[in-house]
């Protein structure tokens, strides 16, 4: 903590002694961020992680907002053959991307993350990978904003002690802070961009790695804007965690919003954008701009649907893009696929699958 404070003092002293006119304000921050990262690297090499050019030759599975619903998550992972009956990873050469918002509303956010971190380690042994993206609800928790936390979660996983939970998320040495702060807000895999909230013409002036780094640094700065950065506020609705103007408006102004989308995709040399955050009222994956823009927050959590889960996932395999919808029921006699979940609750689901092809129309 002392090292961190001293580092910021040195940075601000540097700014104070720079003569006016020596350089433009917008040109200062790259040097400052570079030196900040070099110093912090001594403590945490994750500041140098790059997410702007990940190459993957196998299948990709993308999952949207979970909001504490571990049953929907496990139904997806079982159906897509990523985990077995014992909840261990079994998928060969598969990339799983979870697009943020694991926490809040539901109860099981903490054990979902523990489970996903476990799968990250297991997947490596199967030539697979799990990428977890930061959502705005992860950011809210890291910033100490707990308005969406289910009280039952505090009771079950934090000894019914809100202060204990606060320490776990807000204190830099807290159990969940240490792990969640490393999650990237934005990732590019092949020609696909994944981010939680969305993109806009303003934020897309920055590189993926700059967005990830500066979003993290603002959270570490007590979630306050960093004064010497020209963009200022990465936790606002202009930042990738919250930006939803495109996803909210594209159903009504598709031509205009798709024009913006393709400008942004060209900037990043990408063809597709996958976002969560904006709940789809149909409980199915939304697709716009000739299947180049996918909205995968289907409001799946049973905690927001009176106990009814709506699990969906995006599957990309052999250049084929499909939305997979799982129609879930509890039936004694199941004419479809029966999936037995054993933890945290022993429950049997009858699952019917519906797939929609989402490749662009040529």
UniProtKB/Swiss-Prot annotation:
Alphabetically ordered keywords of this record: Hydrolase, Manganese, Metal-binding, Protein phosphatase, Signal
Superkingdom: Eukaryota
Record protein name field: Shewanella-like protein phosphatase 1
Keyword Manganese: yes
Active site: 137 (proton donor)
Family: Belongs to the metallophosphoesterase superfamily. SLP family.
Record-level GO cellular component terms: endoplasmic reticulum; extrinsic component of membrane
The record's free-text note on cofactor binding: Binds 2 manganese ions per subunit.
One GO molecular-function entry: phosphoprotein phosphatase activity
Binding site for Mn(2+) 2: 101, 136, 196
């Amino acid at each position: 903590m002392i090292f961190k404070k001293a580092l910021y003092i040195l940075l601000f002293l540097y700014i104070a002694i720079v003569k006016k006119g020596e350089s433009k304000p917008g040109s200062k921050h790259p040097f400052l961020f570079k030196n900040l990262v070099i110093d912090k690297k001594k403590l945490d090499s994750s500041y140098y992680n790059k997410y702007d050019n990940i190459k993957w030759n196998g299948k990709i599975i993308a999952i949207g907002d979970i909001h504490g619903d571990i049953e929907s998550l496990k139904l997806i992972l079982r159906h897509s053959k990523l985990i077995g009956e014992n909840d261990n990873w079994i998928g060969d050469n598969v990339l799983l991307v979870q697009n943020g918002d694991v926490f809040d509303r539901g109860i099981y956010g903490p054990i979902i993350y523990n489970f996903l971190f476990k799968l990250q380690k297991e997947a490596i042994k199967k030539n697979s990978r799990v990428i977890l993206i930061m959502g705005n609800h992860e950011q809210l928790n890291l910033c100490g904003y707990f308005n969406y936390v289910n009280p039952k979660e505090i009771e079950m996983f934090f000894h019914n002690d809100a202060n204990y939970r606060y320490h776990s998320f807000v204190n830099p040495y807290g159990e969940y802070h240490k792990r969640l702060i490393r999650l990237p807000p934005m990732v590019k895999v092949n020609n696909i961009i994944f981010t939680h909230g969305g993109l806009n013409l303003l934020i897309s002036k920055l590189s993926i790695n700059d967005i990830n780094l500066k979003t993290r640094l603002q959270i570490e700065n007590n979630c306050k804007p960093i004064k010497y950065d020209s963009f200022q506020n990465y936790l606002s609705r202009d930042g990738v965690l919250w930006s939803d103007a495109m996803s909210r408006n594209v159903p009504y102004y598709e031509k205009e919003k798709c024009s913006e989308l393709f400008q942004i995709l060209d900037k990043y040399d990408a063809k597709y954008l996958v976002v969560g955050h904006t709940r789809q009222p149909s409980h199915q994956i939304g697709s716009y701009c000739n299947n180049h823009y996918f909205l995968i927050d289907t409001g799946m959590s049973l905690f927001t649907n009176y106990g009814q889960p709506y699990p969906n996932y995006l599957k990309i395999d052999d250049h084929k893009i499909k939305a997979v919808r799982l129609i879930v029921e509890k039936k004694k006699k199941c004419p479809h696929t029966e999936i037995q979940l054993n933890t945290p609750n022993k429950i049997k689901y009858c699952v019917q699958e519906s797939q929609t092809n989402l490749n662009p129309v040529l």
